[in-house]
Amino acid sequence: MAFRAQTARLYLSALRHFCRMAMRKGLLTSCVWQGAELPRVEKRHFALTRNELDQLSVLDVHGTRALARNLFVLSAHTGLAYIDLKHLTPQHIERDSSGAWLTMPRHKTGQQAMVRLTTATLALLDKLPKLQPCATGWLQVPDNRTINRHLHVMGHTLHLRQRLHLHMRRHTFATLMLQRGVSLEAVSTMLGHARVATTQRYAEVTRQKILHELGQTQRAD
């Protein structure tokens, strides 16, 4: 039986963990994993195109499936991670003369994420079911396995190129922002990344980006 590199790494990582635990309990006197580091496996990130995201947004679904879809779309327009959706409260929505902003510290890094909210995103946020009271979280967010199960079905319905899952939301957000010409530094701030280098893994060159830049070059010539 053959495994993909990432799957093999996960199994080896679990084996290393249990070997080290056995050593701490005195069940093993030595461990081949002592001091060993598993090589990182670079994963290719996938994003929805603007057209695919629009198709998903208007797909006729109901109940928990509609909730899963709307949470995905909200994240694709704000860059929020799953855990940040669970901790979102009304206090994270600020309004000034320039419009509405979502500002909140990322749960994973503590870095401040800051995204301007469009009218459409605010409308989507308004129609999502809310929790009462909302001291630790405002939105009703199902567990990620439930969301992924519904996303997979919807992706199959839309004949998407890749299996639709939660991890595609932030990559979709970053890719669409970069295609609009937003700088890598600005996208990094929106995502709440501590370093721009972290954002660069989202900045895969897309066909739309190449055509856009070729068009600019040809006009300049």
What positions do the PLM features span?
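N-terminal core-binding DNA-recognition domain of tyrosine site-specific recombinases/integrases
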Residues: 1-20, 63-64, 141-145, 163-165
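DNA/chromatin major-groove-contacting recognition/catalytic segments
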Residues: 59, 113-116, 123, 127, ...
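Short basic/aromatic active-site micro-motif
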Residues: 67-68, 141-144, 161-180
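C-terminal catalytic core of tyrosine-transesterase DNA break-rejoin enzymes
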Residues: 24, 73, 77, 83-84, ...
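C-terminal flanking helix
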Residues: 16-19, 23, 206-210
